[in-house]
A protein has these predicted regions:
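Exposed, low-structure sequence patches enriched in small/polar residues
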Residues: 1-9, 18-313
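Eukaryotic acidic, serine/threonine-rich low-complexity intrinsically disordered regions
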Residues: 14-16
Length: 313
């Protein structure tokens, strides 16, 4: 159970304040069962089934009074397999899930697959490879699907879209680690994340053109690819440690928000140990992140840091 209040007051003459209060009662039910089968010392398999439901009873009072019932139900089953030996570690599972999302009398339901694949390969202590793949889906939350119109200030009103459906997600990671000696190690990686049929905010004229109404529409494909490396080097019998992690990210957003960015990022540090004392200098470049379901670009600043400390274990 939660209570929430939002109060907005302006200094304009003859302007009334805005009060949005909500009372929410939430009921959740979840359960799962797993059958495990050991095939050999190196192989095993499993079957898993699950069910869950969430019910939200939300009452709004104040400037924009409403009563809404939200519910989300899901159920699914998965088959999985694992194999491991001295060089290989492989895991895979495939599932089929049903999900139903309901707001008052309007409901949306879908069946969709879930896939997880991972593999690790270590031919020697100096080399190792790792890869991971995931295919799934994501439902918008209650705030993105609410039919209510809530006033935030004189110029902005918020609402949702009850007809929003699933977005599809793909994740892929590939990494390589190299450690020729104890004093030096390096790694290289590629990471990809994509989300398709993603909802984005849309702003339309409202109240005879005197304000804006923000709602959501399904009109976005989001792609992020990151390529990078990392290095660690120990000198002077391990008393001096150098580290660096350069990478580049490729953001591609299509649809209502057409965004393309390719920021470079690097984090570097040097740490020196003198008995129980340590001294560290670090630097990281400005970061840039693109949020697809908001159509927003976030930029951070460069960061410098000097540390000196003492520790004893």
């Amino acid at each position: 159970h939660t209570n929430y209040s939002y109060i907005y007051q302006t200094s304009l003459q003859d302007a009334s304040g805005i009060l949005n209060s909500s009372r929410e009662d939430v009921l959740q039910l979840r359960g799962s069962a797993t059958l495990f089968k050991k095939i050999t010392d190196r192989q095993n398999a499993f079957f898993r089934a699950w069910y869950g439901s969430t019910s939200n009873d939300v009452s709004y009072s104040g400037t924009s009074p409403y009563d809404n019932d939200f519910s989300d139900m899901y159920a699914g089953a998965a088959l999985g397999y694992n194999f491991s030996d001295k060089m290989w570690n492989v895991s895979a599972d495939v599932a089929l899930q049903w999900e139903k999302n309901k707001i008052n009398d309007l409901s949306v339901e879908e069946f969709y697959p879930l896939i997880n694949l991972s593999a690790g390969f270590s031919p020697s202590k100096k080399h190792s490879f790792r890869t991971y793949f995931h295919f799934g889906a994501n439902y918008p939350g209650a705030s993105e699907k609410t039919p209510n119109v809530l006033q935030q200030n004189e110029l902005m009103y918020y609402t949702g879209n009850p007809n929003l459906g699933l977005s599809r997600q793909i994740t892929f990671n590939l990494s390589y680690n190299w450690m020729p000696v104890n004093a030096f190690s390096a790694s290289a990686f590629v990471q990809y994340f994509g989300e398709f049929n993603l909802y984005v905010p849309v702003f339309n004229p409202y109240n005879d053109g005197k304000a804006l109404l923000r709602t959501f529409e399904t009109d976005c494909d989001y792609n992020r690819t990151q390529i990078g490396m990392s290095f660690n080097y120990k000198l002077l019998n391990g008393n001096l440690q150098l580290a660096a992690s350069p990478s580049v990210s490729l953001y591609r957003v299509s649809g209502l928000f057409d965004i393309k960015r390719s920021p470079f990022y690097c984090n570097a540090s040097a740490t020196y140990y003198l008995g129980n004392f340590y001294f560290q200098a670090s630097y990281q470049t400005r970061s840039l992140t693109v949020h697809g379901n908001r159509g927003v670009i976030y930029k951070d600043r460069n960061f410098y840091q000097m540390l000196a400390g003492w520790s004893r274990s």
